[in-house]
Amino acid sequence: MSKFMMPPQATERVARLGQRIRVARIRRGWSVADLANKAGINRNTLTALELGKPGTAVGVCFTVLWALGLDKSLDAVADPDSDLHGKALEASRRPTRASKIRKASDDYDF
């Protein structure tokens, strides 16, 4: 069984997110215990999130952002309207011209 390896770019983003969460907590004057209690998680889990540990569940991350009042910023994450590459791929698979209108068969005309 192979071990999951995150790409370096993803690892960096997880670490930056953890740092941002830590800054937001400190700006509010909250301890790790304060934010962990507000989010309903263990202090060690919050510390792992702030340290950018990739094994921290995405649900925990969303809950912590909610507890900080930063969850509205998640609306832009993977927004289909902002996915220009996906839109281009979808458009390339559409038929380029309309299909011919087929005459109805009179075989079943009573």
Which residues are covered by each model-predicted region?
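Residues that mark the N-terminal boundary/hinge immediately upstream of a DNA-recognition element
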Residues: 20, 31, 57-60
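Short alpha-helical DNA-recognition segment
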Residues: 29-47
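Short, charged recognition helix plus adjacent turn
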Residues: 75-110
